[in-house]
């Protein structure tokens, strides 16, 4: 399943990020990908050795960790350190699949269940630059407002189309979920959404408490901690 998570960053946060990224050190984006991805990747990334990068990636982690919708959809166990990329002058990233595992500075290795892109450029400011994701439901073309995030299975083939005008800047990361199976995770997300909707409409009740108990028992049964 693919999820649109709006307002992960406020407009003020986005403006501050963009101002700081104007001063960042950018390097060839192929340094963080494998041999297959490097053949189709043509973009730039913020140098992860810089002091500015350390500060910005911490801010992204704080923002996603505080977002209730992100947590409900991803049920994250481990988040990778966020990276930042930039596309301009017809730069693109052809169809590829993300690696199944990635190194993690604290955990050694993590499984990539979900991929996330946090858009930092207004969609009207550039042409092209769509994230195209192929999954079992078809092809999705994604170009979201700055500050919004898209979450999709890392097993999906995806690409970024050439940016023919302007500059597309984004942050991206991977998530190991407590729930490995996409279908089970989607069912828990739907159940959680329905519980919250019923609570807001009718208040607390024995039936809602029973559904909440069901949610947590399923989470207990399926989760890998």
Curated annotation (Swiss-Prot):
2-oxoglutarate binds at residue 168. Fe cation binds at residues 96, 98, 158. Its cofactor is Fe(2+); L-ascorbate. It is an enzyme of class 1 (oxidoreductase). Binds 1 Fe(2+) ion per subunit. Gene3D superfamilies: q2cbj1_9rhob like domain (2.60.120.620), Rabenosyn, Rab binding domain (4.10.860.20). Its EC number is 1.14.11.-. GO terms for biological process: DNA damage response; intracellular iron ion homeostasis. Keywords: Dioxygenase, Iron, Metal-binding, Oxidoreductase, Vitamin C. Residues 78-177 form the Fe2OG dioxygenase domain. NCBIfam families: PRK05467.1-1 (NF003972), PRK05467.1-3 (NF003974), PRK05467.1-4 (NF003975). This is PKHD-type hydroxylase YbiX. The gene is ybiX.
């Amino acid at each position: 399943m693919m999820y649109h998570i709006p307002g992960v960053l406020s407009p003020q946060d986005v403006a501050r990020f963009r101002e700081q990224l104007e001063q960042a050190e950018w390097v060839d984006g192929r340094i963080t990908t494998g041999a297959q991805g490097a053949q189709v990747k043509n973009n730039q990334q913020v140098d992860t050795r810089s002091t500015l990068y350390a500060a910005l990636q911490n801010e992204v982690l704080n923002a996603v960790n505080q977002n209730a919708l992100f947590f409900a959809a991803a049920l994250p166990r481990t988040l990778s350190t966020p990276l930042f990329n930039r596309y301009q002058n017809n730069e693109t990233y052809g169809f590829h699949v993300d690696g199944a595992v990635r190194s993690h500075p604290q955990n050694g290795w993590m499984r990539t269940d979900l991929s996330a892109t946090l858009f930092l450029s207004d969609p009207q400011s550039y042409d092209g630059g769509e994230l195209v994701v192929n999954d079992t439901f078809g092809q999705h073309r994604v170009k979201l407002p700055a500050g919004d995030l898209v979450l999709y299975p890392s097993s999906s083939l995806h690409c970024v189309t050439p940016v023919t005008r302007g500059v597309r800047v984004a942050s991206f990361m991977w998530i190991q979920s407590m729930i490995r199976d996409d279908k089970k995770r989607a069912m828990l997300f739907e159940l959680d959404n329905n519980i919250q909707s019923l609570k807001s409409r009718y208040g607390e009740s024995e039936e809602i408490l029973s559904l909440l108990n069901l949610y947590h028992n399923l989470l207990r049964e399926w989760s890998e901690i």
